[in-house]
């Protein structure tokens, strides 16, 4: 059994350090070390050895993925549903025209914080919190936003600062 994560604690830390994080990531964008991708991947792996997502699942409880057509097709097929039926049951279109869940938390999140469609989950879920992508400095605003929701994203930025500054 994994140790429960104090989501509010990490949220408060992220709020307190938001300006510092923004400045650090902004500087990183201006002058990134040549081996940044390697450093970032190592830190990503280190963070996810410490953080068990199933002890948190805050992303699944509070952030909804933006569904792409490939996601909808894959998940509807998994449930043996026609696309319109899947969309009618689970999705709505937001003010930006994106397809998102009708309700949160995620309807596929179990009481044990496990995803019931893990193998076919949306791309946005698969890639969250995006800390293992190359050229991390290209998504600074998203990274800052993710630190407010995801303890692993917060730790990633903190460890990256320690390593680079």
Features from the language model and the residues they span:
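Short loop/turn segments that flank or connect secondary-structure elements
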Residues: 1-165
């Amino acid at each position: 059994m994994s140790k429960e994560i104090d989501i509010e604690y990490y949220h408060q830390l992220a709020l307190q350090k938001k300006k510092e994080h923004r400045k650090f990531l902004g500087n990183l964008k201006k002058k990134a070390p040549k081996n940044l991708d390697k450093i970032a991947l190592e830190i990503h792996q280190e963070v996810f050895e410490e953080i068990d997502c199933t002890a948190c699942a805050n992303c699944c409880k509070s952030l909804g993925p933006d569904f792409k057509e490939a996601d909808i097709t894959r998940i509807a097929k998994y449930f043996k549903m026609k696309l319109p039926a899947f969309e009618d049951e689970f999705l709505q279109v937001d003010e930006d025209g994106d397809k998102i869940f009708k309700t949160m938390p995620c309807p596929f999140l179990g009481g044990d914080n496990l995803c019931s469609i893990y193998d076919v989950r949306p791309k946005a879920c698969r890639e969250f919190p995006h800390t293992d992508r190359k050229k991390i400095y290209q998504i600074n605003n998203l990274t800052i936003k993710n630190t407010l929701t995801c303890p692993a994203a917060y730790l990633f930025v903190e460890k990256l600062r320690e390593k680079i500054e």
